[in-house]
Amino acid sequence: MRVMRSLRGNSGAGLISRPARLSSLRSVFTGCRAVMLPRFGGPEVFELRENVPVPNLNPNEVLVRAKAVSVNPLDCRIRAGYGRSVFQPHLPIIVGRDVSGEVAAIGTSVKSLKVGQEVFGALHPTALRGTYTDYGILSEDELTEKPSSISHVEASAIPFAALTAWRALKSNARITEGQRLLVFGGGGAVGFSAIQLAVASGCHVTASCVGQTKDRILAAGAEQAVDYTTEDIELAVKGKFDAVLDTIGGPETERIGINFLRKGGNYMTLQGEAASLTDKYGFVVGLPLATSLLMKKKIQYQYSHGIDYWWTYMRADPEGLAEIQRLVGAGKLKIPVEKTFSITDVVAAHEAKEKKQIPGKVVLEF
């Protein structure tokens, strides 16, 4: 990583310290540190820069002084070139989606948050100015108050993954009390969030996982956890399900998941092909091709199995974020953090994730 006068221990440099309500035309904040992505590649392409401009806030936006941000798989994929059709024209960009911190300033129309309040939240997957920076900018509906019962490190690990799971379960499948949910990849952040959200909704949950996460999944309320490295899930699991969330997204898990659904059920995969096809063929060809592929699968599975098929992506959802906050505050939703790094060690953090040295959640601290 190229470091341009790192400001570790002086994250306020280049800033006037007075927090304020900001109009969309001016800002009392001039610049801050940020981890910039000037080109796609391995972890070494990151540059830690100082005095990166802080844009003026729009009326509905909030300036958040970051205390912790998590490293999501999407961050690593974007760094390596995923979504280049969206991001390449805007390089250098700031990656990162999750953040937990303190409100430093608010736009003129923001009503639910105030300066000095501790908050956490997540940006949309295609946001160009991410959260790997001292001062992140999110819209009001992308943030909520951080429960006092958890730390910024713990909070930063939650929102993007939990909102992705929320969209799958509540917007796509619309799960209700008493229904059965099967999760492929229950040990990952999205899968583990889905288990906890479904249990809180009164659902019966079964999950596939690797052995070291089995106890944690059962402790979270799942009724069955199947170690796919040693067990055959098609033999170990009995009965039909109302919904399947596939966080793995391979041909085999899709086949198995579809066959486990009862008629009227919902199959949701995180591995939709809109971005990859657009990257390969461009917007003009790739986006219609992706839409056509999705519709083909929807029609195919509706005809052959009587189920609905979805590509699931995270979206801002104030109602979902409010419920996530409530469950977090009640101790019913958490994502374990395996290791923390300083923001100045972002290259090491990404290298560890890329080499699969740290299977669990990684957080960057400021």
Model-based region annotation:
Residues 2, 25-58, 65-106, 111-366:
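Terminal helix/beta-alpha structural elements that buttress the NAD(P)+-binding lobe
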Residues 1-32:
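N-terminal mitochondrial targeting presequence
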